[in-house]
């Protein structure tokens, strides 16, 4: 449906356009929440169910990313420590090679091009300490993220998918692991697939052990599946520092990467609450939202990514956070991490050929019966607007819901405030 203005003021025409789009007969049973504001003037250009709670899907990542910038900062880095619990001499580490992680999510193909290259560099660092053989095992020490590796309320159907893999203080390739499927005897070759690792921490150690093998370093006892109790004596070999938060957020926001979001949530709990659990983090993020002026009944946080159907946000909450981020010293990091309509990320193929292309910076969201689009748009006369569009529970094809959100965003890009 093409919405047509009624010939009144620009604001009246905009309201008519959005009302027409969201009240089409096919959306008779759908729930829409829309809020559009001009942050410079404080004007509300459009509001529909803006104070109602909706499943936000991946718009929850707006909250997680904003809180991470506010509470951890754009220069925050993750540190992974590599240690020995025995002496090193004559090329032998007479003991275990230990790893203490704190959640570094950056050793992945998505962030580094080829994650094994990073692992090889870590193995080179072990080799630089004169180690060619480890008499014991490769093991992890510490338990920075002691709760479940999956988010609260994640559905069973999601857990076997790439976007539903778990996270831990050690994680390689976003918790994915290669899996070889053996074919029938008459087939030519095996098939190699990638699926969620049963245990992300062990998956990391397996990948690191593979790198050690490539560098001709033998770990005699292999990988220890369980967490090793902290030895009385350990010597630090080296510490690996991740790229900073300013580099991590685009890898989270543009492709809508669930595992990075969950790690950031737990990191907030670890760094600001002393406990790397989702429960600890939810309280801290909630306090941050309240400090920004969000209404206490405007949010329910259950995970960091929005994959949980127990997450609830209002359009008012999202717009408030987007507005507050404009005053943050790291706003450029936040703004540039968002997908750009028609250009990249989850918006690469949307709004092409419209005034929104190359203009709208917004976070998408998509789970069953929930679609969302919230962010920033610059109008035809140069005003930056903030908008949030949430939709839940419809029976029409989901593409129709996404299409309405895109049409609203395009209308905002073409809008003239006066």
Where are these regions (language model features)?
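Extracytoplasmic
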Residues: 29-31, 49-51, 57-60, 75-77, ...
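Beta-lactamase-like hydrolase cores
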Residues: 1-39, 46-52, 122-130
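Mid-domain, small-residue-enriched loop/turn segments at the edges of structured enzyme/sensor domains
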Residues: 31-32, 90-171, 175, 269-317
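Short, well-structured active-site flanking segments
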Residues: 71-85, 221, 331-335
């Amino acid at each position: 449906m093409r919405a047509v203005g009624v010939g009144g003021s620009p604001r009246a025409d905009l309201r008519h356009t959005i009302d027409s789009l969201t009240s089409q007969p096919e959306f008779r049973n759908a729930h829409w929440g829309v809020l559009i504001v001009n942050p410079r003037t404080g004007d509300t250009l459009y509001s529909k169910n803006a104070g109602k709670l909706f499943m936000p899907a991946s718009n929850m990542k707006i909250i997680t990313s904003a809180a991470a910038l506010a509470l951890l900062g754009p220069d925050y880095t993750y540190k992974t420590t590599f240690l020995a619990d025995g002496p090193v001499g004559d090329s032998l580490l007479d003991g275990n090679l230990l790893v203490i992680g704190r959640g570094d999510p950056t050793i992945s193909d998505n962030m580094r091009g080829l994650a094994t290259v990073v692992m090889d560099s870590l193995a080179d660092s072990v080799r630089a300490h004169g180690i060619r053989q480890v008499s014991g095992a490769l093991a992890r020490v510490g338990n920075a993220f002691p709760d479940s590796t999956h988010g609260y309320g994640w559905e069973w159907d999601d857990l076997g998918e790439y976007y539903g893999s778990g996270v831990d203080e050690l994680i390689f390739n976003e918790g994915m692991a290669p899996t070889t499927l053996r074919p029938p005897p008459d087939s030519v070759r095996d098939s190699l697939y990638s699926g969620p690792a049963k245990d992300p921490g062990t998956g990391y150690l397996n990948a690191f052990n593979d790198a050690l093998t490539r560098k001709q370093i033998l770990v005699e006892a292999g990988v220890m599946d369980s967490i090793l109790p902290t030895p009385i004596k350990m010597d630090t070999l080296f510490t690996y520092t991740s790229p900073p938060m300013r580099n991590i957020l685009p890898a989270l926001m543009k492709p809508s990467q669930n595992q990075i979001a969950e790690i950031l949530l737990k990191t907030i709990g670890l760094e600001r609450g002393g406990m790397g659990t989702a429960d600890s983090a939810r309280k801290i993020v909630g306090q941050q939202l309240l400090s920004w002026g969000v209404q206490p009944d405007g949010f329910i946080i259950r995970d960091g990514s929005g994959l949980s159907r127990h997450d609830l946000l209002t359009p008012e909450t999202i717009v408030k956070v987007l507005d507050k981020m404009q005053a943050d010293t790291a706003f450029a990091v936040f703004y540039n991490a968002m997908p750009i309509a028609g250009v990249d990320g989850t918006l690469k193929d949307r709004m092409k050929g419209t005034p929104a292309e190359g203009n709208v910076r917004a976070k998408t969201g998509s789970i069953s019966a929930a679609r969302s689009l919230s962010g920033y748009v610059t109008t035809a006369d140069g005003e930056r607007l903030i908008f949030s569009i949430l939709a839940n529970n419809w029976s029409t094809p989901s593409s129709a819901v996404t299409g309405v959100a895109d049409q609203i965003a395009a209308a905002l890009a073409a809008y003239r405030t006066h």
